[in-house]
Swiss-Prot record:
Protein name per the record: Cytosolic Fe-S cluster assembly factor Nubp2 homolog
CDD domains in the record: Mrp_NBP35 (cd02037)
Cofactor field: [4Fe-4S] cluster
Recorded name of the encoding gene: Nubp2
UniProt-listed InterPro entries: Mrp-like_CS, Mrp/NBP35_ATP-bd, NUBP2/Cfd1_eukaryotes, P-loop_NTPase, YlxH/NBP35
GO molecular function terms listed in the Swiss-Prot or TrEMBL record: 4 iron, 4 sulfur cluster binding; ATP binding; ATP-dependent FeS chaperone activity; metal ion binding
């Protein structure tokens, strides 16, 4: 049930291992840190990592008359989370389903979860372009979807896959809000100097080629890695870091597009 959701943002990646779920969770936490009510929906059915990234593993989902009740990270209910990871007995249990069963589960996630009033719903998708993505886009035709953010890394193979994602967005009619280049450079935990370990600026060049905003370049920062397994936002814990600055910029970009003012 998305009738109380003001804005829907889909997060995509061309391939796995680019840090898409980390970006999704930190974006959701950044939106919450700036005064928004946020929902985070993890539809990566075969590799759900959002419960782990937020330290919510082992939490149980309950049903009410209106559907599934998402997991809330705090008493004020400013961040609600839903993932198939909450429905599995063990984190290591594989989800071995064919396409139709995956499609049915995603439709349930989009129609049978009792979201309260949300400023933003962030949908973390599996990598690539598959049945899951097509199902999401079909379901969101009845609900205003603001668009998609693509996460990539500087390597050439990742950038090649992003081109496929851009084509996918065009063919499915979803607006591309921008590209985030992740894992670009390594931040020394001692002096905080950032050193490029892969090629750089690939995300910016691709955004320019596709004529969409380049939302920022996120480095590999061990200090941000320490935040995994908690609901701590880089904006609160590392306010002066480049990661926090980029996330703050993305939040401002989304607020400008959606006309939803931040409180903080």
């Amino acid at each position: 049930m998305l009738d109380k959701v003001k804005n829907v943002i889909v997060v995509l990646s061309g391939k796995g291992g680019v840090g898409k779920s980390t970006v999704s969770t930190q974006l959701a936490l950044a939106l919450r840190a700036t005064g928004h009510k946020v929902g985070l929906l993890d539809i990566d059915l075969c590799g759900p990592s959002v419960p782990y990234l937020l330290g919510l593993e082992g939490r149980d989902i309950f049903q009410c008359d209106d559907g599934w009740v998402p997991i809330y990270t705090d008493e004020s209910k400013t961040l609600a989370v839903m993932s198939i990871g909450f429905l599995l007995k063990n984190r290591t249990d594989p989800v071995i389903w064919r396409g139709p069963k995956k499609t049915m589960m995603i439709k349930q996630f989009l129609s049978d979860v009792k979201w309260d009033e949300l400023d933003y719903l962030i949908i973390d998708t599996p990598p690539g372009t598959s049945d899951e993505h097509i199902t999401v886009m079909e379901c969101l035709r009845e609900v205003p979807c603001n668009g998609a953010i693509i996460v990539t890394t500087p390597q050439g193979v990742a950038l090649d896959d992003v081109r496929k994602e851009i084509t996918f967005c065009k063919k499915t009619g979803i607006k591309l809000l921008g590209i985030v280049e992740n894992m670009s450079g390594f931040v020394c935990p001692h002096c905080t100097e950032c050193t490029n370990i892969f090629s750089s600026n690939g995300g910016a060049e691709l955004a320019n080629l596709a004529q969409v905003p380049h939302l920022g370049t996120l480095p590999i920062d061990p200090r941000v890695g320490v935040l995994a397994g908690s609901t701590a936002s880089a904006l609160d814990e590392l306010p002066d870091s480049s990661t926090a600055q980029i996330l703050r910029g993305i939040v401002q970009h989304l607020d400008a597009l959606t006309a939803v003012p931040a409180i903080a």
